[in-house]
Amino acid sequence: MQLFDTLRGHKATLEIPKDRPLTLYVCGVTPYDTTHIGHAHTFLIFDILIRYIRSQGGQVTYCQNVTDVDDPLFERANRDNIAWDVLAKREVDQYLKDCTAMNFLAPDFFPKVSEEISGMIPIIEGLLKNGKAYVANGNVFFDVSSEPSYGEMARLGGYEELLKTANKRGNNPNDPNKTDPLDFVLWRTSNPGEPTWPSPWGPGRPGWHIECTAMSTRYLGDQLDIHGGGRDLVFPHHPSEIVQTEGYTGKRPFTRFWVHGGLTWLDGAKMSKSLGNLVFVRDAVLQQSPDSIRWYLASFPYREDFNYIRADAKAAEGEIAALVTALSAPVGSGPVLDVNDDVTAFYAALDDDLAMHIALTHLKSIITRINAKSGTHSIRAAQQQLRACAGVIGFKAAE
């Protein structure tokens, strides 16, 4: 299939392996608050990608992590006067309930940072040995000057723009322990009241980026087929993963395809936990069917940002009602209904950079044609094709 690779900046051919499963790593949630529709959109993209690859005879090994050691989690736990691990468990449990409600495929591996820290130490030691990192007062930093290509994925136009963006996303440019303001943390001393783990550099905790390198390489190997997440990870998270993973393993590329979903907006602002302008999945599924939410989220080009409009999302209930009607419509004894053209176009759309929004137009056409001919035409084969196509999009109604 053709798939857009963020690092290359264009579509390229993704060869689906025949002798092994395709490996997919997706950056998961930081469990300090409940899953929102923006998260659901990101995970829907990869859910449909997996379903499509499997429909074409491929296999996928899927790893999605939980970032349960991170500043936002500790800050929220401190604010709410709750133990950080209790908060994390509560929100992970809710997240899994939301995933079940949305009919998301369960990952093959679901590692939590808090259970993987011992595996990060050897990687950091390797980066120090390879001259990619340095120690300063119990902290370890990656030396970005050792990798001139650092940040090229983001196409931000130069050092100052990289630094400005990194600063907005957790970087501390004024840390006196750093050689360069853009250098990022591999291991850090913990703040008072935060959890710590032992290390050769003293007690502390890992930096954000090294966590994903350790988990992805442990469960999927040193080189991945696809690495994904939301577009907000295009910098600094994913470029940091690239340089530290390749700096440790010596193998390039770390990932064949970088796939990023667009961000979800609400009332003119990016939907985010920090802003508090959220539509929680747990609330949305009480107001409408999960299938209708899935239809609505799949109706946008996956790489583009979109504005979530509650009324439009609710209107997708009509599409699901029509789907259910078509799947159970009475079969007539007249001519056979031929929907092969729409079925072919449906799969062709997904084959061309996972164009879910285009695939849905052909799915809707199949539904409309079946409902128009129910009771008069022989629609059994068309219904079977519809069920298969709807299954690729992941509709529970098709199961």
Predicted regions and their residues:
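Short coil/loop linkers at secondary-structure junctions
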Residues: 59, 83, 105, 223, ...
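Short catalytic-loop micro-motif centered on adjacent basic/acidic residues
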Residues: 63, 107-111, 227-229, 380
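Alpha-helical recognition segments enriched in aromatics with Gly/Pro capping
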Residues: 1-32, 47, 118-331
